[in-house]
Each structure stands twice: as structure tokens, then as C-alpha cells.
Amino acid sequence: MLIVGLGNPGANYERTRHNIGFMVIDELVKKQNAQKISSSFDGTLFKFSNHFLLKPLTFMNLSGSAIRDVKQFYKIDEVVVIHDDLDLPFGTLRFKKGGGHGGHNGLRSTDEHISKEYIRVRMGIGKPEHKGEVASYVLSNFTKDEQAHLDEFITFTCKAIEALLTNTLEDVSSKYTIKNFPLK
């Protein structure tokens, strides 16, 4: 399985909403003691067991090419993409296979390069008050209230990803789909 976290490279974007996929990959690398195996493929690639973790180092809009290259080189069938989702309130976690990109340029690029048939782990980041503020919103840091729960949300998402390694999407979705983190 190839598990991809979407985000933008560089320190300026490290803790922004758009980089929540990168944050999950960073945590999975630690939890799984994954080994860095390559900085090729326009990304940083890690491996644990028979699974791969990828952080594309292209900007978000071009991430599909890195995913395609790793998928083809290692002949990987199953791809999971972790991404921010404006249409879900902060702390909401949902799972989906296939479907549209919903205006998300990282998903659009992925769809163009590998098809739409991959698992999406949708992490809610909320949306800005005004539609015209989307770009600045996704590239901004989380609020203090959100930051207070962000690590817990990321850890919970990691548990869901780990469950996907040995369970069906339906089982994982029924157990780990949440609304408005933190759980009470």
C-alpha cells in the first residue's frame, strides 16, 4: 500500500491547514519507525513492512506525478491519499474511494495521474467566512482552539490509517469516521 500525505514543501507551510496530510505522514513515520528510502520521485519516500509513505515535494497542484511515479516503480495497487477538506468542519474524519476532487488541486492532479480509484482520507479543516479567502485560509495556521486538538486529531487519523493496513475500507470507515473532534 502507498500512503500519501498531501501538502506543500518548505518551512513556511509546515503547520498550515493545507499540510495536514504531511503532518499525518510525519507521525506515521515515527510510529512505524519507517525508514527513508528515497528522495527521488519528486518526494520523500519511507517504507515499513511492505508499505510506503510518501510526501510529494512538488507543490500541492503537481503532486499527482510523484504519486504515479512511485506507484508505477514499485507496482503498487492500493493508494491512500490523506488530505485537507474545506467542506468538513475541523476535526471531522471521513473515508471515501473514488469520486470527484471537489476543487482540491492536489486531488485533481492525483486523479489526472493515477485515476480516481484510490482511497481518500478526508480531514476536515473547516472553511473561511468568505469564499474569496480560500487560498489564504488553507495556507494559514490553525487557530489556537484547533491547535489544542490538532495532535490528538492527527494521532486518531494515524490509528485509522494503521487499521486500513489490515481491514476493509468499510470496517475502518464505520469505526473511525468522526465529526467535530475531539471525541467526547
From Swiss-Prot:
Site (Stabilizes the basic form of H active site to accept a proton): 84
Keyword field: Cytoplasm, Hydrolase, RNA-binding, tRNA-binding
Site residues by UniProt (Discriminates between blocked and unblocked aminoacyl-tRNA): 8
Top-level taxon of the source organism: Bacteria
NCBIfam families hit by this protein: pth
Enzyme class label: hydrolase
Subunit structure: Monomer.
Main location (coarse class): cytoplasm
Function of the molecule: Hydrolyzes ribosome-free peptidyl-tRNAs (with 1 or more amino acids incorporated), which drop off the ribosome during protein synthesis, or as a result of ribosome stalling. Catalyzes the release of premature peptidyl moieties from peptidyl-tRNA molecules trapped in stalled 50S ribosomal subunits, and thus maintains levels of free tRNAs and 50S ribosomes.
Subcellular location: Cytoplasm
Residues engaged in binding tRNA: 13, 59, 61, 105
Any one Gene Ontology molecular-function term assigned to this protein's record: tRNA binding
PANTHER family referenced in this protein's UniProt entry, alphabetically: PEPTIDYL-TRNA HYDROLASE
Name of the molecule in the record: Peptidyl-tRNA hydrolase
Claim: Cytoplasm is one of the keywords in the record: yes
Family listed: Belongs to the PTH family.
A cellular component annotation (GO) from this entry: cytoplasm
Residue positions of the active site: 18
Keyword Chloroplast: no
Originating species: Sulfurimonas denitrificans (strain ATCC 33889 / DSM 1251) (Thiomicrospira denitrificans (strain ATCC 33889 / DSM 1251))
Enzymatic reactions: an N-acyl-L-alpha-aminoacyl-tRNA + H2O = an N-acyl-L-amino acid + a tRNA + H(+)
Gene this chain is encoded by: pth
EC number: 3.1.1.29
Record GO biological process: protein quality control for misfolded or incompletely synthesized proteins; rescue of stalled ribosome
